[in-house]
Amino acid sequence: HSFENGKLIPVPSTVDYHLDYTEPAGDINIKLKDYIKFVQLNLQGIHGENNYLKADTYKFIHKGIENYSMGWYNIYENGKELSTHSGTAGTYYSLVHIDRIRGKAFIIFTNSFNQETQQAVRLLMRKLKENYGS
């Protein structure tokens, strides 16, 4: 959905939607089960298991340089280490948090994007982590 004049408007699949070339992975087309697998591979790699990539590569991607990662935002607080990533191209919003210490991940996908969506996703993420441990 797009957000126009205060209303969510469905975007038909026939719309020829183009992103700016500076968008590195914007609007990636992936099935949820495949994205879950992608995140699971990252979790396994962070915990030392070689799979699609070597474990050292995952560690570099997530923590390679102090206060920097490759495509992930790092959060260090209250004894926790999280890799997070969010994305939108204006018609959806996604958020993933990977708890690198506990080996858990939380993934939220929506089919709309506006401030209310972002706020709802943040609240849902907080509740998921409260209820399922992170």
Describe each model-derived feature in a short phrase:
Residues 1-7:
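Mobile, glycine-enriched helix-loop/loop "lid" segments at the mouths of ligand-binding/catalytic clefts
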